Amino acid sequence: MTCLEPSFTEPPGVGDMLRDARDSRSAVKNSVLEAVGSTPIVRLSRLFDESGLEVYGKLEALNPGGSINDRAAYNILTHALASGVLTHDCTIVESSSGNFAIGLAQVCAYMGLRLVCVVDIKTTTLNISIIEAYGARVDLVSKPDPESGEYLMARLKRVRQILDSVPNGFWPNQYANANNSGAHYGSTMPEIAAALGADIDFVVVATSTCGTLRGCADYIHDKGMKTKVVAVDAMGSVIFGRPSGKRLLPGHGAGMVPTLFKPDLADIVVHVSDLDCVLGCRRLVQQEAILAGASSGGIVSAIERLAADGVMLPGQRVAAILADRGERYLDTVYSDSWVQEKLGNDALSI
């Protein structure tokens, strides 16, 4: 019996991939922080094929710290160091439900800065472990603020207490810092416009601190783009004037109106439930093989709703900012038992 050497047929696209890999040799970074930003944009053709929309997802999970918050953390701290407001003998203290804390912890680890992250009991054990792995200290708030019932307000009170107790304390204050929105004015939205053109019809952004929303909206306005901004907020969030309510998933929505917010930032506001986020995330991973965080599922559900309502029309082009990676939600969004316990036994049959 003669054994013949099998012929090799290069799979479609592999040649381009290899050429891109060779070209990337000239783009070697000098540090992990230089890898923040310039995230890829991919066509979500399978998920939105029937709607006739051209939807493009910006994969912020591919930032080195795993989320879009890497941009803000890096921008805030580098500007603070450059201005002299932050020095290496300072202790940085910040409130975060997870992603911004991770972004800060990464920057601080590289720059040799001390960091205390104030989190609450909704922060996942995985996120806490990541923050601590970078060398930051975690301060856990276990009870909500008695006046507002919000964990965010309790975290902010704890931040102020710690700042009063440490010498040379520095509070980045992601909810009010112009260098938060400046990160997206200077990188996120320009990257979208460069890749997809200034005539993109919609940009869809999940809200929390309103840094991404503010930066993208201000850029669109200042550049005279006709792009409409869609803000996707969580039900129970107070950002757009709705009453406060229970929210199970961290990092989406807010229990206060951030200083970065302006009433005219969004052309369209869509409120999504925790279940909308869960189902949207699962459709995204099942159809596009993108394992994304909770707010990305909310964006998927919001686009589907706007398409069904005729707000987004066939042929229009949509940029969806997918803020973070899904591994941090395996015990919640992607856990059948958690979903059934928190959202009802029939939640996954919808």
Set out the residue ranges of the language-model regions:
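PLP-dependent amino-acid enzyme catalytic core
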Residues: 1-350
